Amino acid sequence: EKDILVVFPSLNWGTTKFIEEHKFLDKVFKNVIQQYQIPQTKFIIGGLSGGGMVSMRYAERANENIKNTYIKPKAVFAIDSPLDFSHLYQQSERDIERNFSEAAVNESKWLIDRYNSEFGGSPKDVPLEYVKNSIYSQSEKDGGNAKFLSKTPIIIYTEPAIQWQMKNRQRDLYDLNCTDISAMINLLQIRGNKEAELVVTHNKGIRPNGTKHPHSWSIMDSDKMLNWILEKLK
């Protein structure tokens, strides 16, 4: 109806550096272009959480050097994606120390082990590795890799739901993805990206089973997102 082809690649956790994920996406893009004769300049990519992380790093690598990727995304979107791996590591340490939510503790232990293995240590041990691989780095004046999004249309949805976080995870604003998301979008706007947008929602996070959770697809307004995509594809 809108003359848009939607592709849902099945991406499971591969590497924190997203090397294998990006290789897989390159194959997907190549097949789609060959099968449907879609111009390489007409792709918009994005996703929830990890899917958004993979998409934003793909766009950054494409903008850094077009030889890095098969396509250069025309725009990118994300829903409540973590951006700064150093921040995420530190937040995971706090979740383990609090020992309040079993789900949060288990995920945090998994993440710390993974980062220590792939990066060669903690952010204190190898800070440059974290800057090198993060979508955004709060420690860097230019935002680290975020500088490669300075000319790319980007929209990120996030729902802080601070009361829910305090009650269900004992987390505060320092622990949430919204801090880095707002910081990165603000930086991009300051650097002249007039198409960098932040959407903060309230009470929209609902899982398919009806459970309230702010880290959910439902915080994205599908109709507005479709209109945004159509506008960027012009």
Locate predicted features.
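Mobile cap/lid helix-loop segments that gate and shape the active-site cleft of serine hydrolases
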Residues: Q91-K147
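Conserved alpha/beta-hydrolase
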Residues: K2-T16
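Short beta-to-alpha linker loops that shape the active-site pocket of alpha/beta-hydrolase fold enzymes
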Residues: S10-G14, P82, K204
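Acidic catalytic loop of the alpha/beta-hydrolase fold
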Residues: A161-M166, Q170-Y174
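C-terminal catalytic histidine-bearing segment of alpha/beta-hydrolase fold enzymes
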Residues: I154-Q163, T179-K234
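Phosphate/oxyanion-binding active-site loops and adjacent basic polyanion-contact surfaces
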Residues: K17-L25, G50, L176-D180, W217-S222
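Alpha/beta-hydrolase active-site loop
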Residues: K17-Q37, M53, R57
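Primarily recognizes the serine-hydrolase "nucleophile elbow" in alpha/beta-hydrolase
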Residues: Q35, T41-N99
